[in-house]
Regions:
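Phosphate/diphosphate ligand-binding glycine-rich loop within oxidoreductases
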Residues: 1-81
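Glycine-rich adenosine-cofactor-binding loop
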Residues: 65-68, 78, 87-109
């Protein structure tokens, strides 16, 4: 049975929390998407390229696998909306983590 809980973790406690046995998988939000990259034993191709993790899984051997599903979520949204971006321009406002992900997704289309 899966249970979802909110963990509000102060930055000073992040490493200890990640090493704890209080979780098997996490959805990571701002401000920790970049900070958890260095804690991962393995990264998906997207997480490696973006240096941003929003999904963490603890493997049976205790190592952490990091992925970035934001990229695929944005790509899915564009593709399923019926918008053909070919030959079009896009304006990405902002310079935070989401803008890096959106820019990478747009470059794939």
């Amino acid at each position: 049975m899966l249970r979802c809980r909110l963990f509000e973790v102060p930055k000073a406690d992040l490493d200890a929390f990640l090493c704890s046995d209080r979780w098997d998988g996490l959805n990571v939000t701002i401000p920790y998407k970049k900070a958890v990259v260095s804690c991962c034993g393995e990264l998906s191709e997207a997480a490696e390229r973006l240096q941003s993790v929003n999904t963490l899984v603890r493997r049976p051997d205790g190592t952490l696998y990091g992925d970035n599903t934001d990229l695929f979520g944005f790509l899915y949204m564009v593709r399923s909306s019926g918008i053909d971006p070919a030959g079009k321009k896009a304006l990405v406002l902002g310079s935070g983590g989401a803008s890096v992900t959106v820019k990478a997704a747009l470059e794939q289309l």
